[in-house]
Amino acid sequence: MKPVTARKRSGTGATVNQMELRPENSEHLQLIRAYEAGSVQIGESFYASSFLLAPARSPVEWQVEQFSQINESDFAEILTLSWDVLLVGTGDQHYLPDLRLQRMLARAGRGIDFMSSRSACATYNLLALDGRAVAAAIILPLRASAVTGR
């Protein structure tokens, strides 16, 4: 939301500053509209498997089912994209990569943050709406217990 200019309230003798909020024009951005345990809505489409996302690019499937399986080749495609910050949603919990993967990603010379997939979805939208060069690699499901029925 973008602030609109303050207004002067008349008739009371006092000056009151009001801020009116209007939605930003985000039609051209690929944004996450909703998420639940087993799926994420981007625009009008729902995704039930892991995906890669950038504001100016349609989501593509990411062949990662759980963070423990992740390896260097899983980042090959996303490292070719233009971004300053990569958010890696690690699934239902927050995990950090092993030392080998950390070294490989450090060589990319760009910011990479690991967080739960739910947090990555929310953070992605904030950065995209702020005009940041962001990309996201989201592992689904967001919450294992909801998917398995526990």
Labelled PLM ranges:
Residues S117-A122:
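Short acidic loop-to-helix transition motifs that present clustered carboxylates
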Residues I78-M115:
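Mid-chain, well-packed structural core segment of small domains
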Residues K2-S73, L81, L129-R150:
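Non-catalytic interface/targeting segments
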Residues V60-W62, H94-P97, T123:
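Short active-site-adjacent helix-start/loop capping segments
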